[in-house]
């Protein structure tokens, strides 16, 4: 079901108190992150106040929250963030649709409408670092709260930390959180001359295909079957992420090969949150920034690969990164070591199929409560040409045991992918969110 939204208001929300700093140093990883928003949409089916009161409370609490997350109210200037209190953009919209009807007949193509609208041709460098859009459904049936934050300063873990703090402030009137920013704690700052050398993320000249985003749901029973199939002597008990990512990569690779006269090498890049792998004395678990690393899996153009083989390589490479982190912590070289690892993939030839995979599982999306309960559903969308990439994002289902996979592929590959019977043996294409 397509959602037709009408924007009813747009304003800039500034921090309730002035920024305590003038600038925030960006790391070399921040600057290499693409000029895109990291975005999530929270859907709520119960609002205890009127839409006017709810919206006003969100604005007031956002202002208070920005006082703690003050860089998000700033703007990027060169190699740092100017903490100039320019503010975040707050957009309000309405739709006549009822939330239950929308979730029962979900049209994933319409989800981008719940994200902030960017001016045509506007450079990512000019975007606000934080944009919020609140959409009220018809007859008081629910509300969607979307949060988009620049990937130049935040990863998904940072976004969740921010939204939880904002929700707590809305619901309880205050938050006692102490916020720390990663800056160059892990990754070093770039040399001052490097700014002119950075590749532009403002151009879409390299985008030659139309990309399509689809949602697939893995129920717990099917995940158990898949894990059993993915098991091997070297990895007798795969994780659900290992099993699902391996299946998706195999099927996506097969879809690509079916559309190519000459098969290409395939590389899968799996992102990792290093907060979970470093002691809190180095960086707190809820530190704000891009604290990501990862590892790659490579297959030659003619290689055939089965799921247990992919899982075994997945586990081996993941453990290699974990061991590298432990060793580099002792020598205080963690940032340089992880950058070298990521450079292996970045330097790959452009004539390859590159798949960017990220697991958002175990992130507390469903704990985001603005005062009237947990979300009925958490959705994902991308909304600009800069988000066009072959990628996969995994998110927990509300019950926590199932997984929703959001998969972006070139249109011609997706038309084959959605009919892959090996995939459909374990996943359902876009089932209703509510019965």
Curated annotation (Swiss-Prot):
Keyword entries, A-Z: Acyltransferase, Brassinosteroid signaling pathway, Cytoplasm, Transferase
Catalytic activity, EC: 2.3.1.-
A Gene Ontology cellular-component term: cytosol
Induction: Accumulates in response to brassinosteroids (BR) treatment. Induced by darkness in roots.
Main localization, broad class: cytoplasm
Family to which the UniProt record says this protein belongs: Belongs to the plant acyltransferase family.
The protein's name: BAHD acyltransferase BIA1
Organism name: Arabidopsis thaliana
């Amino acid at each position: 079901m397509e959602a037709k939204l009408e924007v009813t208001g747009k304003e800039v929300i500034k921090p309730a108190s002035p920024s305590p700093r003038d600038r925030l140093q960006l790391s070399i990883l921040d600057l290499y992150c693409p000029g895109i928003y990291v975005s999530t949409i929270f859907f709520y089916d119960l609002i205890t106040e009127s839409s006017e009161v709810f919206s006003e409370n969100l604005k007031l609490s956002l202002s208070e929250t920005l006082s703690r997350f003050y860089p998000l109210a700033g703007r990027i200037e060169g190699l740092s963030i100017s903490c100039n209190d320019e503010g975040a953009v707050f957009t309000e919209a309405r739709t006549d649709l009822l939330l239950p009807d929308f979730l029962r007949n979900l049209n994933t193509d319409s989800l981008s409408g719940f994200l902030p609208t960017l001016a045509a041709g506007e450079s990512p460098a000019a975007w606000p670092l934080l944009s919020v859009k609140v959409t009220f459904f018809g007859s008081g049936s629910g509300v969607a709260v979307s949060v988009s934050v620049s990937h130049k300063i935040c990863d998904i873990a940072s976004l969740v930390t921010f939204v939880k703090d904002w929700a707590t402030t809305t619901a309880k009137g205050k938050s006692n959180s102490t916020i720390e920013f990663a800056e160059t704690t892990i990754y070093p700052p770039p040399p001052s001359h490097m700014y002119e050398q950075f590749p532009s993320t403002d151009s879409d000249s390299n985008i030659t295909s139309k990309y399509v985003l689809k949602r697939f749901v893995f129920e717990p029973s099917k995940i158990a079957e898949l894990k059993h199939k993915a098991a091997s002597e070297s990895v007798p008990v795969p994780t659900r992420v290992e099993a699902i990512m391996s299946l998706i990569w195999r099927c996506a690779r097969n879809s690509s090969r079916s559309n190519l006269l000459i098969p290409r090498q395939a590389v899968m890049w799996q992102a990792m949150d290093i907060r979970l792998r470093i002691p809190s004395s180095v960086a707190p678990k809820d530190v704000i920034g891009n604290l990501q690393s990862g590892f790659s899996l490579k297959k030659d153009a003619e290689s055939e690969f089965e799921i247990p083989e992919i899982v075994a390589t997945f586990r081996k490479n993941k453990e290699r990164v974990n061991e590298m982190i432990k060793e580099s912590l002792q020598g205080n070289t963690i940032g340089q070591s992880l950058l070298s690892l990521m450079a292996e993939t970045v330097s790959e030839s452009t004539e390859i199929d590159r798949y960017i995979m990220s697991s958002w599982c175990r992130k507390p999306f469903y704990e985001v409560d603005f005062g009237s309960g947990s979300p009925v559903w958490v959705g994902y969308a991308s909304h600009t040409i800069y988000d066009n990439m072959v990628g996969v994002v995994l998110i927990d289902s509300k019950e926590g045991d199932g997984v929703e996979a959001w998969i972006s592929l070139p249109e011609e590959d997706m038309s084959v992918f959605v009919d892959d019977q090996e995939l459909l043996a374990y996943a359902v294409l876009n089932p209703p969110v509510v019965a």
